[in-house]
Regions:
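Active-site anion-handling motifs in enzyme catalytic cores
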Residues: 1-167
Length: 167
């Protein structure tokens, strides 16, 4: 069985983010019939009910550690998670989740991400340093790819994909 953890802005009743999560889950289930999916979410009950997956609360640090430790991969997926316009705190939260997976020697994949804007100098350095260590970067548009290029992200190769909801 393949254990996948998905991190994103889920469990807040945002229609776009929930549609993104449904698309990611559907794609994973099509590709990996025996996949077990756990979502890091703001509302475990809602995520379980709406998506029929396992869930761990986004502020349950020990639960997140345990979940990632027993997984095969972390997918940071969908939406514009890596930006500091709405909140620098959220940027550092998502970077922390990815860093945690890397500390636990788990591959990290960015899936259909919209990147930026990331305005702070320290924030740009933090994004660059972390993303240079992930296994795969998939962005949803050319502007996101350019933002990563402008930040100095040189590896892994950045792939422009369709927004998961549209694919």
């Amino acid at each position: 069985m393949t254990n996948v953890v998905i991190s994103g802005y889920y469990g807040f009743a945002n229609a776009g983010d929930e549609a993104m999560l449904a698309a990611i889950i559907g794609s994973l289930q099509d590709m990996i019939p025996d996949v077990s999916i756990t979502v890091i979410t703001g509302n475990c009950a809602m995520t379980r009910e709406n998506h029929h997956v396992q869930a761990v609360h986004r502020f349950n640090l020990f639960g997140i550690i345990k979940t990632i430790a027993s997984s095969n991969i972390l997918i940071s997926g969908g939406g514009s998670l890596l930006q500091d316009v709405t909140s620098a705190r959220s940027l550092y939260y998502y970077l922390f989740i990815m860093r945690l997976a890397l500390w636990l020697h788990k591959p990290v994949m960015l899936y259909a991400q919209g990147i930026g804007p990331v305005r702070g100098v320290k924030a740009r350095r933090a994004v660059r340093a972390l993303l240079q260590r992930v296994s795969m970067i998939g962005v949803r548009d050319a502007d996101s790819k350019q933002e990563l290029c402008d930040m100095g992200v040189t590896k892994p190769p950045v792939v422009v994909t369709a927004d998961a909801v549209l694919s």
